[in-house]
Amino acid sequence: MIIEGRNIKESKVLLKTKYCVIGSGAGGAVVAERLARDGHEVILIEEGGYFSPGSLRGDTEAIAMAKLYRDAVMQSTDDQSITLFQGQAIGGSTFVNHALCFHMPHELINEWISSGIIKDFTSDDLEKHYSEVERFLQPKVTPDKYMNSSTKLFHKTFQDRNLSTTFTKRNTNGCIGCGSCFRSCDIAAKSSTDLTFIPEAINNGAKVYSDFKAEKIIFKGKTATAVEGTIMSQMKQAKGTFRVDAEYIVVAAGALHSPWLLGRSGIKNKNLGKHLKIHPIVPMQALFKKDMDSFNGVPQAISSFQYTDYKNKKEKGFVYYCDFSGMMGTSTHMPGMGNELRERIGKLRKMGQTQIMLLENTTGEINCKKEKPVITYNLNEMDKNEFVKASKIMGNLYFESGAEAVYLGNQVFTSPDQLNGISTDLFEPFASHKYAAHFQSTCRMGASSKDSVTDNSGKVFDTENVYVADASILPDSVGVNPMLTIMAFASLVAERLSKK
């Protein structure tokens, strides 16, 4: 059973455990399950609420997303030019993501090992942990009958031109292609952590609390003694306080909030909140003569890594994901206002969309001294030029596949020749829609505190018992959707921590 803070009547809750895990997403849930399985006393706390399968079925996209995403889908960079999607519920971002499962490229993990960033484990060790978490997820390729028409067109267009595509494995079981992954799965067909790792942790004795917002780790010298925070109401207002006394604390609040929590708890490390990678995305849309009905089917089932180069340390390229994430979300990416926009929305059935995801050179940072994380991220010229290249290629592919028009940011292109006018100006702040959901490397692991925040076991330098187990410990961008890699690294941290 999950204990919901919104239903707790006491104004102050005091708890005690051996291990306190903060966060229930791809990192925290995996750690809690492993520790509980090994017979340890575990309390897992999550700031977001608990939503049972199907409980959001009657909500509109806007209402459901406001409940499930941090800041009601309004979290962004400090200049508000890049929207930052992050799940805030039991299950974390696994509750609202598209369930894509990738192993990180061998070139990258080998680069980390050869450079000395990782010394205590090998790529074979990591593969063991991928296998461990895949036992729960059972990732598989989406059956053809559940792929939407945009996916099929994307595949044919790329294959006809000898461009590579990948049918992506997804952690689903019983998926029927309803297309609502981004707002949870109404039929519980997505193997998010709330349906996999967390129930197993509870079965093995772990206690799980929703609506518990961790705000400070209490230290005595270098030893953490407790986590303190606020109990949130259903409307995300403060309704009480809590304290969890613990022998070990595992921070898994995500790469935006883990460094913030450590910073406001007194951790002083020059790398804290630095080295932020986000995999920035620009959506490109295409208007066709025929009805596409792209909203019928799995939102993301195919991708292309044709233009990636994982051996290049500066320009690793970009990935195309065929994507159609709901009518509301897709409509917000269209150019125009007023009647012009209304007319375009009226043609939504004829639309296709591709995400252009950059394996960026840019690095951002988080200010951990404010009341909430302040994220600074400004695309450098190299990355803007990569977006230009990627947009021209995809735009031409759309026209070759029969598109009448292509939309990019506030621009409408009606012929291939017009694509030549795409320049870096279109990727300045607010000139095009940009968003991200893959936040990484802000508490990165490494050999020493000179360039890292945690060691290779996930322990925070200069502490005795504080660990991090989420995307923030990844030394750099993993170059693919990071969920499975986050889980593998969390499994590794949990294995070592369980021996304490």
Show where each model-derived region lies.
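A glycine-rich dinucleotide-binding beta-alpha-beta segment and adjacent secondary-structure elements
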Residues: 16, 167-168, 174-181, 216-220, ...
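N-terminal Rossmann-like FAD-binding beta1-loop-alpha1 element of flavoenzymes
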Residues: 18-44
